[in-house]
């Protein structure tokens, strides 16, 4: 199971492209509203989340996904439940996936020390201890980062590759007619 944490001001495609890809692959994914079930994205799109952040469990958790966007990233970072699940995922070597501005949250928690990572331009200084990459998506151990909305599908396919393997991910890519 993956939790995709959504806070008001999140970048819609960065959250929903990975959800779509993982669900097509029959991977359990729950969208989690930070502060309620209905969350408004940075472009005014309202999303009714599967659950809120009050009744979550770590049972069966495979990883977490943190979309970027502003002020969504700031809202994620200040939420204690999001922080708890980042810590749990890090301690248990689960996948921690962050895109756009959201890798800054991982940098602030010193989770990128000695890792290679990418982010939206302008947030590089927040990736404390990381070796910066210009690549759209970077996977280093249990951490997957991506640089923005234009990489949302590649981000989703990289998460899928980490869970079910590259061949499985490539086959779904072909089925979806994605490069």
Question: What kind of region is each of these model predictions?
Answer:
Residues 111-113:
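Conserved hydrolase catalytic core segment
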């Amino acid at each position: 199971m993956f939790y995709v944490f959504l806070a008001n001001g999140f970048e819609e495609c960065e959250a929903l492209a990975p959800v779509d890809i993982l669900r097509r692959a029959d991977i359990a994914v729950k969208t989690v509203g930070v502060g309620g079930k209905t969350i408004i994205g940075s472009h005014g799109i309202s999303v009714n989340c599967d659950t809120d952040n009050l009744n979550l469990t770590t049972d069966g958790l495979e990883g977490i996904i943190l979309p970027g966007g502003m002020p969504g990233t700031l809202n994620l970072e200040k939420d204690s439940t999001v922080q708890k699940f980042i810590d749990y995922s890090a301690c248990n070597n689960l996948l921690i996936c962050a895109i756009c501005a959201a890798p800054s949250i991982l940098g602030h928690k010193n989770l990128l020390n000695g890792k290679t990572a990418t982010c939206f331009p302008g947030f590089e200084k927040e990736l404390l201890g990381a070796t910066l990459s210009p690549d759209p998506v970077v996977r280093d151990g249990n951490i997957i980062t991506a640089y923005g909305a234009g990489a949302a599908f590649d981000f989703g396919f990289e998460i899928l590759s980490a869970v079910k393997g590259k061949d499985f991910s490539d086959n779904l890519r072909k089925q979806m007619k994605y490069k």
